[in-house]
Design a protein with these regions (language model features):
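Charge-rich, low-complexity N-terminal segments
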Residues: 1-44
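Assembly/interface hotspot detector across virion components, adhesins/toxins, and nucleic-acid enzymes
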Residues: 3, 16, 72, 81-84
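Short, flexible coil/linker elements and helix-boundary hinge sites characteristic
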Residues: 26, 39, 59-63, 122, ...
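Acidic, glycine-rich loop-and-strand cores that form catalytic or ligand-binding grooves
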Residues: 31-75
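Aromatic/pi-system hotspot detector in well-structured domains
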Residues: 54-64, 79-88, 112
């Protein structure tokens, strides 16, 4: 089974906001309003936009190349965040090693190359995850 021995401290120390992630990736932060989407869906769309940028930055390899999950490598570890949702609030439960298969229930853009990165993202960006996963009907 493959494991990665990368030091994830650089990424977690560098990426503490959406803007930090954009800077690390060398892209300009954008703030789309998703006006073409139903108003109730906009917070989720904005959060997803930010999360994929943040996760891409967190998953950068030490050589600054992007990590892209390879579903052809059966034993490549991939991690996802598991949430408990109670009273419309998120509670971080754990990260799970996602086995490679043709079935990707959580979406490959939201996977992590290591458990520490997944745990960091869950804690640091909990509000974004909540906006992405929960419909706020207020």
């Amino acid at each position: 089974m493959e494991t990665n021995n990368f030091n994830d401290d650089l990424n977690t120390n560098t990426v503490q906001s959406y803007e930090d992630a954009c800077q690390l990736l060398g892209i300009k932060p954008t703030y789309p309003k998703f006006v073409q989407c139903a108003k109730i869906d906009r917070p989720s769309m904005i959060a997803y936009h930010k999360l994929i940028i943040i996760i891409r930055a967190l998953n950068l390899l030490p050589n600054s190349k992007p990590w892209i999950p390879d579903f052809n490598k059966l034993y490549e570890s991939k991690y996802r965040i598991w949430w408990n949702i109670i009273d419309n609030k998120l509670s971080f439960a754990l990260t799970a090693n996602t086995p490679s298969s043709a079935y990707a229930p959580f979406g490959s853009r939201l996977l992590f190359r290591s458990r520490p990165l997944a745990e960091y993202c869950a804690k640091q960006f909990k509000d974004l995850w909540q906006d992405y996963l929960i419909i706020n009907q207020e």
